[in-house]
Amino acid sequence: MAEGRSSKNSPSGQIDIVQVDGLTVLKIIKHCEEEGSSGDLVQGVLLGLIQDNRLEITNCFPFPSNKAGDDEDDDDVNYQMEVMRRLRAVNIDHLHVGWYQSTYLGSYINRTLLDSQYSYQKSIEESVVLIYDPLRTSQGMLTLKAFRLSDEMMKLYKDGEFSADKLSKAGISFHSMFQEIPLVIKNSSLMNVLLCELDENTPTPSADQFLTLSTGSYLEKNVRVLMESVDELCQDSNKYHNYQRSVIRQQQQKENYLQRRQQENQSRIQRGEDPLPDEDLSKMFKPLPVPSRLDNLLLSEQVNTYCQHVHQFSTQSFGKFFLAQALQDKKE
């Protein structure tokens, strides 16, 4: 990974917009379609520059596919350094500004993404991650989004404590973990002319296809992964509830012990005996380890993402359905 800052024009690391070259988008799509066609995760490096609060992504290259038994870390670092050295030799933008990865049905909110993006932003403050979903794109919607960790999440991750109290004090919820940056795709003038020419020469599809309802397999897959994530979220919530019950039970045991001890001391004093010696209650009632709420945050955000996908898909399908029904009624 490249170290140091890639620009002096954005001292705060604030990025308001991400601008991606059309050719770079095609490279990302080509890599994800070829290497990730079977659902495998593919990743790559983003190169570019920073102008004020705009991050311009002008090039990219994929991570190599490591086989079992390879020294992946050393190979990846050597590969990246060699590619960037060759790009620098031919005067191509070689500044490391982030990374990209593919996803399946939006299943990208996990610890791996969080750890990787934290490492990138710690080294290069303005870096982002691009998420591309080939399956949703095949449904007619180019799904390419840019994310970065919020400043609050970066501070909390640095401390390494994700207890409920820490999250509450920091004001972090699953909505504020990641910050989505507006993304625009920029093409050259010649590219725009070519696209217009291709659009004019492309045969017009049959007029009766615009009301074709989408297949239910996509919705079925989304609902299935949504149910799996909800089950995991329920299990994580049950673990935290068990912890809370254990804390309450331990506190009750501690209060009962102190009450019995106080009664015993009063009885000993009445009999003219010395009270019981002081004891270290922290050894008798050891504090229970506070469970991390990080998994709960990630699962909540993942469930929210699945719900948004189902909502968008259902809205489009219902719109077509009602329009088709109105046309059919008018025809009759």
Swiss-Prot record:
Annotated region described as Disordered, given as residue ranges: 251-285
Keyword Cell wall biogenesis/degradation: no
InterPro entries registered for this protein in UniProt: eIF3h, eIF3h_C, JAMM/MPN+_dom, JAMM_MPN+_peptidase_M67A, MPN
Residues of the MPN domain: 18-153
Compartments reported by the entry: Cytoplasm
Molecular function, one GO term: translation initiation factor activity
Domain of life: Eukaryota
GO cellular component: eukaryotic 43S preinitiation complex; eukaryotic 48S preinitiation complex; eukaryotic translation initiation factor 3 complex
Key words of the record: Cytoplasm, Initiation factor, Protein biosynthesis
Leader sequence residues: none
Family: Belongs to the eIF-3 subunit H family.
Function: Component of the eukaryotic translation initiation factor 3 (eIF-3) complex, which is involved in protein synthesis of a specialized repertoire of mRNAs and, together with other initiation factors, stimulates binding of mRNA and methionyl-tRNAi to the 40S ribosome. The eIF-3 complex specifically targets and initiates translation of a subset of mRNAs involved in cell proliferation.
This protein's name: Eukaryotic translation initiation factor 3 subunit H
Originating species: Nematostella vectensis
